[in-house]
């Protein structure tokens, strides 16, 4: 399966890190130059339009990330690929990723996208709908943070390109949010993670790479963290009413219906034996905080 990783030209440290990760597990990958959020105006065919989606506005860094993923989807079509694995440049891989990618390559067209990583907070997932080797695939039933590692089919890339013309949303919410007929799955246990989400005692082995991630310009450059305009008051009221109703429905019916159908509320962790051998310690990343129902998230 063709693998891409997204990397800004001016952050070679992350490129070095990702090349090391791919070598570690024996995979080859093509570097894809990320869209530079500081030069968005220099790019042609940027499809971001304020208010044209789930959000009212998004910041430049989010536009750059979204455009980078869109352009990889376009590259898939240009290269006539039936499927591809797409990664951001702050990832850690388990060796099992090789087996999972190989098995997924033979499983199409049973899915549109398969999420390989996790942000390690609870997300409602369906009962297993497919089993790929040791990995049950559960349909993602809510927003799911992180677009750091996923497999996508050609047909799904075409569909996402159409849906995102125009767009105003975060790339992870846009890619994995439930839609009628959209087959977005979570593979469990996960085989990849952003470095900042790894268990502290394990991630300390990657201290230099972690520092590179922590120093991401998205977090520290004020030019990329400009304030966005608030939606008009009536829209904000409607959004809050809808959010409150979803909370009520989740508490009254949602959780029970999910569990009775074989679904789970899962944080999609890495298998302890994959990280630590037989030493099964708590893999909750530092600072995760109290686990909350998905309806509690704004």
PLM regions: where:
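An acidic/histidine-cluster motif and surrounding catalytic segment
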Residues: 1-87, 91-298
């Amino acid at each position: 399966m063709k693998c891409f990783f997204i990397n800004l030209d001016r952050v070679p440290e992350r490129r070095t890190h990702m090349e090391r990760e791919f070598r570690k597990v024996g995979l080859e990958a093509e570097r894809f130059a990320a869209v530079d959020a500081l030069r968005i105006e220099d790019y042609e065919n940027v499809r971001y339009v304020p208010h044209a989606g789930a959000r009212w506005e998004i910041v430049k860094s989010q536009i750059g990330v979204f455009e980078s993923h869109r352009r990889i989807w376009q590259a898939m079509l240009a290269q006539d690929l039936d499927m591809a694995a797409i990664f951001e440049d702050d990832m850690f891989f388990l060796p099992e990723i090789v087996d999972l990618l190989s098995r997924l390559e033979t499983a199409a067209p049973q899915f549109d996208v398969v999420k390989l990583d996790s942000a390690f907070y609870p997300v409602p997932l369906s009962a297993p709908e497919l089993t790929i080797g040791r990995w049950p695939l559960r349909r993602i039933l809510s927003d799911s943070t992180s677009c750091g590692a996923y497999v996508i089919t050609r047909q799904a890339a075409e569909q996402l390109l159409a849906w995102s013309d125009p767009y105003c949303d975060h790339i992870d919410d846009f890619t994995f949010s439930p839609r009628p007929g959209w087959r977005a799955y979570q593979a469990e246990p996960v085989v990849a993670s952003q470095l900042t989400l790894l268990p502290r005692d394990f991630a300390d082995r990657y201290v230099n790479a972690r520092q590179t991630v922590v120093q991401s310009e998205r977090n520290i450059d004020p030019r990329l963290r400009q304030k966005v305009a608030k939606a008009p008051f009536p829209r904000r009221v409607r959004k809050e009413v809808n959010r409150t109703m979803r909370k009520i429905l989740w508490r009254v019916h949602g959780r029970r219906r999910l569990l009775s159908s074989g679904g789970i509320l899962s944080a999609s962790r890495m298998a302890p034996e994959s990280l630590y051998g037989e030493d099964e310690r708590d893999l909750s990343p530092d600072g995760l905080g109290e686990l909350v129902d998905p309806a509690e998230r704004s």
